[in-house]
């Protein structure tokens, strides 16, 4: 893994910082694990914008990732590591002993030729998946389930991980990267290690067009709009002088957005404390 700063041969290249990984496969992905991915442009079935700043971008295939890790007690060998345009993490193509191939999230330290396994009695080794009741307290894990058998939902992006800090009865207590501590059923599975490609955060796109390649459209400030378009709009010169709100008048910047009382009891400590 190398951080490469581009030479300033043009204004668009001047600030570009790339993350180069020579370990990644340079050929095509495994065709049987690809699915179609159609663009929405941020519109719903009525054609109305439901998510702003989405549109365009390069065509992509979706890679079918095994988040459930439910091929139990069947050893597999990592064939290669690959780039995935749909996520910040890299992925690994695994060939299992029964001949099936699956993509998994590539943890830090995993390389082509490594053996991995999933199951209650799998060894504590990077890339292996097992129920958290069998993982030692203090271990670093990723791709953590919230419900047994549903598949990993926590710690899936590049460089992310969760630490198991306690085990009491049927629950384990996890410390998330945000600082939040929450309880999860000990039967839920997790994968040992942290997600690889942690240098992803160091990359610099360098120009607006690089964001457009990724399907991200410009974000216009509310103060630059007319009063008809945004509560912050209008006025001669730069006028603001009010509490910041969304284009629909809902308070923002500090307003609580969590509305799931049902699972509040599982949060031991809120994030940022």
UniProtKB/Swiss-Prot annotation:
Family named by the database record: Belongs to the universal ribosomal protein uL2 family.
Gene Ontology MF, one: rRNA binding
Organism: Aggregatibacter actinomycetemcomitans
Protein name, per record: Large ribosomal subunit protein uL2
Function: One of the primary rRNA binding proteins. Required for association of the 30S and 50S subunits to form the 70S ribosome, for tRNA binding and peptide bond formation. It has been suggested to have peptidyltransferase activity; this is somewhat controversial. Makes several contacts with the 16S rRNA in the 70S ribosome.
PROSITE patterns tied to this protein: RIBOSOMAL_L2 (PS00467)
GO BP of this protein: cytoplasmic translation
Compositional bias ranges of the Basic residues kind: 253-262
InterPro entries: NA-bd_OB-fold, Rib_uL2_dom2, Ribosomal_uL2, Ribosomal_uL2_bac/org-type, Ribosomal_uL2_C, Ribosomal_uL2_CS, Ribosomal_uL2_dom3, Ribosomal_uL2_RNA-bd_dom
Disulfide bonds: none
Region (Disordered): 221-262
Subunit structure: Part of the 50S ribosomal subunit. Forms a bridge to the 30S subunit in the 70S ribosome.
Pfam families reported in the protein's UniProt record: Ribosomal_L2, Ribosomal_L2_C
Any one of the GO CC terms: large ribosomal subunit
Tagged with keyword Ribonucleoprotein: yes
Keywords: Ribonucleoprotein, Ribosomal protein, RNA-binding, rRNA-binding
């Amino acid at each position: 893994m190398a951080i490469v700063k581009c030479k300033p041969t043009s204004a668009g290249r001047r600030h570009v910082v790339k993350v180069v990984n020579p370990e990644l496969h340079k050929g095509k992905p495994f065709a049987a694990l690809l699915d179609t991915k159609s663009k929405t442009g941020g519109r719903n079935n009525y054609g109305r914008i439901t998510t702003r700043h989405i549109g365009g971008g390069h065509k992509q295939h979706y890679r079918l990732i095994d988040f459930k890790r439910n091929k139990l007690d069947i050893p597999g060998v990592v064939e290669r590591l690959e780039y995935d345009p749909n996520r910040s993490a890299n992925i690994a193509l695994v060939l299992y002993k029964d001949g099936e191939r699956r993509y998994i999230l590539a943890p830090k330290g995993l390389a082509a030729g490594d053996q991995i396994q999933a199951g209650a009695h799998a060894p504590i080794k990077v890339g292996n998946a097992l129920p958290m009741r069998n993982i030692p307290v203090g271990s670093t894990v990723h791709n953590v389930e919230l419900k047994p058998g549903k598949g990993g939902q926590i710690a899936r992006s590049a460089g992310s991980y969760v630490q198991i800090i306690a085990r009491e009865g049927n629950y384990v207590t996890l410390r998330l990267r945000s600082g939040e501590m929450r309880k999860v059923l000990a039967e839920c599975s997790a994968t040992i290690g942290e997600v690889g490609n942690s240098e992803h955060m160091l990359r610099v796109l360098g120009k607006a067009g690089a964001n457009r390649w990724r399907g991200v459209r410009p974000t216009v400030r509310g103060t630059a709009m007319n009063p008809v378009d945004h509560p912050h709009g209008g006025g001669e010169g730069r006028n603001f002088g009010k509490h910041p709100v969304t284009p629909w008048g809902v308070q923002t910047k500090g307003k609580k957005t969590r509305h799931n009382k049902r699972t509040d009891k599982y949060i031991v400590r809120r994030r940022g404390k």
